[in-house]
């Protein structure tokens, strides 16, 4: 192996924790910006209140990640089982634009349900521009899509 990974069985929990902390910090800042931009009275709104709301939303979102992962697993399975040309699950994950669109949607939908302004639509529009598939973050799509 040319480049040895520092991640091992012994360090995976540490690395995951660091990444989750980074996600929480970055997402909190973006949610804060979205909340401020959406609130036309934000000039008079206490910064601490919006900051606390953004952090709470980010934390709640992070706790939904296992649920999102589970839904995506059913989506991969459904796509693989429904397409005789699919060689394996990895091909569906890495090569199918529909999976990219549904992945972005699943993340955006959770943020949408949490009341985050702007960001969910931006996430689905990223997939739309890359794949041509437009899914509104408020759409209700069950498992095995």
List where the protein language model places each region.
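Terminal amphipathic alpha-helical/low-complexity segments used for targeting or macromolecular assembly
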Residues: 1-125
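Short loop/turn and capping residues at structural boundaries
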Residues: 122, 138-139
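A structural motif detector for beta-strand N-caps
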Residues: 127, 133, 139-145
């Amino acid at each position: 192996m040319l480049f040895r990974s520092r991640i091992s069985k012994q360090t995976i929990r540490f690395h995951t924790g660091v990444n989750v902390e980074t996600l929480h910090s970055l997402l909190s800042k973006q949610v804060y910006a979205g909340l401020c931009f959406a609130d036309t009275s934000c000039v008079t709104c206490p910064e601490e209140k919006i900051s606390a709301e953004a952090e709470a939303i980010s934390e709640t979102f992070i706790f939904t990640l296992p649920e999102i992962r589970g839904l995506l697993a059913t989506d991969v399975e459904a796509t693989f089982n429904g397409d005789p040309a699919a060689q394996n699950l990895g091909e569906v994950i890495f090569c199918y634009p529909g999976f990219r669109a549904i992945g972005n949607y699943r993340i955006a939908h959770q943020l949408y349900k949490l009341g985050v302004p702007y960001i969910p639509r931006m996430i689905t529009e990223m997939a739309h521009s890359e794949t041509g598939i437009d899914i509104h973050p408020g759409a209700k799509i069950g498992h095995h899509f």
